[in-house]
Regions:
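C-terminal non-catalytic interaction/assembly regions of soluble proteins
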Residues: 1-147
Length: 147
């Protein structure tokens, strides 16, 4: 597959408080928009929320959000076009999605780059972990020990 990302920042406390619901609404809107286009099961979307749980995800022990959150939307599609399209839909939906307490209608997220969707290229997945028991550690290469 191929990866496309978009990066944005949020400072609206209401947006941050409703981020789980907002993410669900974004995914649902994309599914509705692409329904019947033959893209079902051809992409994944991940939201990395730096300043909330961007590093540890659901294992984050500190559940107190800061005053701003950095959003990295990570889309992997079967084709580059699918990745770019879904990333663009995610960006535009995040920008204009409604949520309780919303005051600004001009945009919810600040995007530092234009164009906001960044093609990252082919995706590689680590899927094999090689371990080999050997009798002689120097058989496959030189080993040096330093003190």
């Amino acid at each position: 597959g191929y990866r496309a990302i978009t990066i944005g920042g949020v400072r609206d406390a209401h947006f941050i408080a409703h981020l789980n619901d907002i993410q669900s609404a974004v995914v649902e809107k994309i599914e509705q928009t692409l329904a019947g286009q033959g893209t079902a099961n051809s992409y994944t979307i991940k939201f990395h929320r730096y300043g909330l749980d961007g590093v540890m995800g659901p294992w984050e022990p500190m559940r107190q959000p800061g005053h701003e959150v950095g959003l990295l939307v990570d889309v992997v599609g079967k084709t580059e076009a699918i990745a770019q399209t879904v990333c663009g839909l995610a960006r535009s939906t995040l920008l204009h999605v409604s949520f309780p307490g919303r005051l600004a209608t001009a945009g919810n997220v600040a995007f530092p780059f234009s164009p906001a969707e960044i093609p990252v290229g082919p995706v590689y997945e680590f899927n094999v972990y090689h371990l080999l028991e050997i009798d002689d550690p120097e058989r496959f290469g030189r080993m040096e020990v330093f003190n």
